[in-house]
Curated annotation (Swiss-Prot):
SUPFAM superfamilies: Photosystem II antenna protein-like
Stated name of the protein: Photosystem II CP43 reaction center protein
Keyword DNA-binding: no
N-acetylthreonine carried by residues: T15
UniProt function note: One of the components of the core complex of photosystem II (PSII). It binds chlorophyll and helps catalyze the primary light-induced photochemical processes of PSII. PSII is a light-driven water:plastoquinone oxidoreductase, using light energy to abstract electrons from H(2)O, generating O(2) and a proton gradient subsequently used for ATP formation.
């Protein structure tokens, strides 16, 4: 395909360190990018870029399969998943595979199957990636026009966007079908401490589903992260899947409007920046979800949330001291507030002491003890079940506060287990990756806008120090 603009003008700041490492058609002379600039060399080689993306997908799926089998091989059924540093098996368990009442693992075979399926898929993707990177056509426009594209062809780009949206919508519906028809999913709120169940009564009311989007993101409200029943989660996926599929069909059938053609930058690097920006938002949302939400991420598999561990500690000591004869309704703490129970600013009865700041926690082991005005004193005296005591004692000693070089758990809890919670791993990694992707979004957006405006300068290549240095080889 003929290059429609000057490489010198657009691709200006790359220096070749070692000319012998480049392949024909992918060297600095023909692309303006050196080998270490990676896929930038393939901007105008749609066939080779396809190979790079398929191979990348193969690496991702290979990691999923290999890590899945690694976790299965190391899994000890007697210990909770969160004590074993697992991050993939909890996701499979949440989808209802291999678990029974209370989140107990009763069968690891589905986990093995998942790992093997991903390994086999990765082999297919790996072969396709190598084929398209080395053997397939360099460009797809001539032989396979449906799969070919020019980056500034606005109509083709929105068609590709539409196809992606439809695939995302189908992905959302996979979860819906699993929850409705294929065995159900794990519900941490099922009576008696959680169980796998089919979701029958979906929440489809737009006022409820979109009400989450209108909530404040701060404490007590918690935006979409505050979702706490599976009917809403699965109903939300019905809405999201439908919107994605309908939006995909819309983008395939229509051309961009004039305002969009004017407002957006239409180049490969611009699309990269848009994608990185979206992934950054996903990363930050996932961080908050796995840290605070114990419905989408059940504590049976991921360990308690921070607020949950704190409230569990207060509950455990209330149970202990009540057995020893304390009147938990009236006992006074060192500050003059209630030692075990007090009132929140809005009048609910809540746990006293330091855990008062987590008074809006909702957890399946605690909710049965609440009445219309918060914690119910008569229920606390008569209705506490052994499973609630066991679970809160377990969560009290497994706060998600450990770090790689510290002792895990709450500093004031002498029985804390020294471990790093999967919530810590997943929240931290997604926050850090979200931040890096945001920086990448800014970087590529800046470059794309500069190239579109035609004012980027780069460095004067004629008098660059590296030109007078001896080659690396």
């Amino acid at each position: 395909m003929k290059t429609l603009y000057s490489l010198r003008r657009f691709y200006h700041v790359e220096t070749l360190f070692n000319g012998t490492l480049a392949l024909a058609g992918r060297d600095q002379e023909t692309t303006g990018f050196a080998w270490w600039a990676g896929n930038a060399r393939l901007i105008n080689l749609s066939g080779k870029l396809l190979g790079a993306h398929v191979a990348h997908a193969g690496l991702i799926v290979f990691w999923a399969g290999a890590m899945n089998l690694f976790e299965v091989a190391h899994f000890v059924p007697e210990k909770p998943m969160y004590e074993q540093g697992l991050i993939l098996l909890p996701h499979l368990a949440t989808l209802g595979w291999g678990v029974g009442p209370g989140g107990e693992v009763i069968d690891t075979f589905p986990y093995f199957v998942s790992g093997v399926l991903h390994l086999i898929s990765s082999a297919v993707l790996g072969f396709g990636g190598i084929y398209h990177a080395l053997l397939g056509p360099e460009t797809l426009e001539e032989s396979f026009p449906f799969f070919g594209y020019v980056w500034k062809d606005r109509n083709k780009m929105t068609t590709i966007l539409g196809i992606h949206l439809i695939l995302l919508g189908l992905g959302a519906f996979l979860l819906v079908f699993k929850a409705l028809y294929f065995g159900g999913v794990y519900d941490t709120w099922a009576p008696g401490g959680g169980d796998v169940r089919k979701i029958t009564n979906l929440t489809l009311s737009p006022s409820i589903i979109f009400g989450y989007l209108l909530k404040s993101p701060f404490g007590g409200e918690g935006w979409i992260v505050s979702v706490d029943d599976l009917e809403d989660i699965i109903g939300g996926h019905v809405w999201l899947g439908s919107i994605c599929i309908l939006g995909g069909i819309w983008h395939i059938l229509t051309k961009p409007f004039a305002w969009a053609r004017r407002a957006l930058v239409w180049s490969g690097e611009a699309y990269l920046s848009y994608s990185l920006g979206a992934l950054s938002v996903f990363g930050f949302i996932a961080c908050c979800f796995v840290w605070f939400n114990n419905t989408a991420y059940p504590s049976e598999f991921y360990g308690p949330t921070g607020p949950e561990a704190s409230q569990a500690q207060a509950f455990t000591f209330l149970v202990r001291d009540q057995r020893l004869g304390a009147n938990v309704g009236s006992a006074q703490g060192p500050t003059g507030l209630g030692k075990y129970l007090m009132r929140s600013p809005t009048g609910e009865v809540i746990f006293g002491g330091e855990t008062m700041r987590f008074w809006d926690l909702r957890a399946p082991w605690l909710e049965p003890l609440r009445g219309p005005n918060g914690l119910d004193l008569s229920r606390l005296k008569k209705d506490i079940q052994p499973w609630q005591e066991r679970r809160s004692a377990e969560y009290m000693t497994h706060a998600p506060l450990g770090s790689l070089n510290s002792v895990g758990g709450v500093a004031t809890e002498i029985n804390a287990v020294n471990y790093v919670s999967p919530r810590s791993w997943l929240a931290t990694s997604h926050f850090v990756l979200g931040f890096f992707f945001f920086v990448g979004h800014l970087w590529h957006a800046g470059r794309a806008r500069a190239a579109a405006a035609g004012f980027e300068k780069g460095i004067d290549r004629d008098f660059e120090p590296v030109l007078s240095m001896t080659p690396l080889n």
